[in-house]
Amino acid sequence: MENLKETMRDVLENNILSYWLTKVKDEENGGFYGRVDGNDQVHPEAEKGAVMNARILWAFSAAYRVLKKPEYLEAATRAKDYVHDYFLDREYGGIYWSVDYQGNPLDTKKQTYAIGFAIYGFSEYARATGDKEALDIAISLYHDIEKHAFDAKNNGYIEALTREWNPIADMRLSDKDENGSRTMNTHLHIIEPYTNLYRVWKTPELEKSIRNLLDIFTDKLLNTETYHLDLFFNDEWEGKRNIESYGHDIEASWLLHETALVLGDKVLLHKIERIIRRIADAADEGLRPDGSMVYEHWKDGDKYDLQRQWWVQCENIIGHIDLYQYFRTEENLLVAISCWNYVAKHLLDAKNGEWHWAILEDGTVNKEDDKAGFWKCPYHNSRMCLELIERDY
């Protein structure tokens, strides 16, 4: 496994993070550029997204925590300062969804998903450095979510609200999503930062929130017929249950496992491990003979989205390494290695750095979507490298 760990460190440092340090830093307006397109062209006046900037903060904080290189701390601090100065809403709490290239608020809605990623980034910075201000911001954002976005009546987290935390008509994260008031994706990216915050701020209040989120996954989001996680719901948790998202399934399998491990409750861990193994089995329906994992299955009409998106491969690799590490199942190690071989051959851009967005159904590289941008960040692939470097498997 040492060879795999060495490969991951090389990819992390010389293919991913180096790209962000040399290509994406915005020296004129601060922080990082909002977009570098699929042909590596910088768009200096592109809007800057909260999710992208919070993920940059997380990635460089985590890289510094593990590798202790000063340039990673410098980049993490740059991202922290930018989110602090331009995205935090000092009047109403939470963070803005986007700012323009000069840092002026653009879309001021409160997307719970984005606030979750800000918690993830600030808590990781605190974890890596011991910085009290970063921890205080993460805690404050946690309280913002619990105060404004948690629906106690229906037990779930509201997808989005206005800047002032009032109801909003269009709650979608992106044009690709259904306009549901409850989504699996947002709940996944709340339990993920809450778990990370718990590592540095172990309080009964936060533990209660995390345990409740696990219950929401097992009682509301999990389709107990298929063991896929369903994606879109209304306030009362009614949903079409018509899409199977393999990448989200395998990502959830290891993130929920991580949550149970961090909580340290053996009874709960045993319960969650049974479930996450079945979720991972369901996700494996997306595996293909070339080692990759395809994107989605739409049960209406039995159609498949066969593109191989970069992030799905990352989560596929972590998820199967997690299964191998804890349950010693050799076939899961082989799945992870096979998927990595696919990534190295098709998605990783060895010439220009970073990874392509996807390989399309016809086998060509997707260069229409970004190398760095609103939804393309050094998060999934950096995390994959760091997980494989840090884990004992």
Where are the regions a protein language model picked out?
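Glycan-recognition and catalytic cores of secretory/periplasmic carbohydrate-active enzymes
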Residues: 1-393
